[in-house]
A protein has these predicted regions:
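Short alpha-helical "patches" and their helix-cap loops
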Residues: 10-21, 54-56, 127-135
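Electropositive, glycine- and tryptophan-enriched low-complexity nucleic-acid-binding patches
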Residues: 96-156
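Short, conserved catalytic/metal-binding motifs centered on acidic residues
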Residues: 1, 12, 32-36, 72-86, ...
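Gly/serine-rich nucleotide phosphate-binding loop at the start of the catalytic core
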Residues: 1-30
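Domain-level cores of phosphate- or acyl-group-handling catalytic modules
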Residues: 136-193
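Short, structured patches in soluble enzyme cores that scaffold and shape functional sites
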Residues: 118-120, 131, 164, 184-188, ...
């Protein structure tokens, strides 16, 4: 779906009548959504990863990759995604969960993976992904993925961006040990770091600016927090608040 820039394989199938999918004999060459899904499900990731790296190397050599923020360099975004779910079929790689339905509690089996994309000026570029295994959480899968990225793409990025689930000391230490910076969402209001940051933000005047569409942005940026002792170093906390005026 990332390569086709479509939201689903069904959306891709709707374009099969377009001229660019037809050969000189006017026959349609785009497979159905089911066929595309069946073929991709049998693809070995070991063969896909070299192809993804080749795309990156060529684009880098052709200078078609430009950083979104030149002063910060390139960033990798890590995020978990659920690819499929079923109540009737499962495999050795499925993750089980209990779901409350009208018929009672049922066991649902699903697949989940962590994706790594390179953020650049014109969008994102898929680098790699890692399946989440039974009995582990998303961060464990992301840690394996990140170690492989450090080996396969040692100079491709300078920054790792993730959501609040990744705000853990071992994960941040792994990133820092490889000379990279990390950004994660801080949303657990029980943490000392969150409480200390909110206390200082109340005492500091924000930087205020206007955006298109009647949006007012307030930003706070404070460094030197020591309220995360497990990390072993000071951290920086940034807060933003947007207010939109509706007439």
């Amino acid at each position: 779906m990332l390569l086709s820039r479509m939201g689903s394989f069904n959306a891709l199938e709707q374009t099969k009548s377009c001229f660019y999918w037809k050969k000189e004999d006017k026959k349609e060459v785009l497979p159905s959504a089911d066929t595309v899904g069946n073929v991709i499900s049998d693809v070995d990731l070991a063969t896909v990863r070299p192809a993804l790296k080749q795309v990156y190397v060529r684009r880098k050599r052709n200078k078609s990759l430009k950083p979104l923020f030149p002063k910060l360099g390139f960033a990798v975004i890590l995020d978990g995604h659920e690819s499929s779910a079923s109540y009737k079929r499962c495999c050795c790689g499925c993750l089980p969960r209990k779901v409350e339905t009208d018929a009672g509690t049922r066991i649902q089996f699903y697949h989940r993976h962590v994706t790594a994309v390179l953020l650049h000026r014109d969008g994102v570029l898929l680098l790699d992904l890692e399946m989440q295994r039974p009995g582990e959480d998303e961060v464990a899968a992301a840690t394996r993925l990140l170690k492989r990225l450090f080996h396969d793409y040692p100079r491709a990025f300078d920054l790792v961006i993730a959501d609040g689930l990744y705000a853990r000391a071992p994960f941040f230490k792994l990133v820092k040990d490889h000379g990279k910076d990390a950004i994660a969402v801080l949303k657990d209001d029980r943490r000392d770091l969150f409480q200390d940051a909110m206390g200082l933000f109340k005492q500091e005047a924000p930087v205020v600016f206007e955006r298109d569409g009647g949006v007012t942005c307030e930003c706070w940026d404070i460094e030197g927090f020591t309220s995360w002792p497990q990390l072993g170093q000071d951290v920086r906390v940034v807060r933003s608040r947007e207010t939109k005026t509706v007439k």
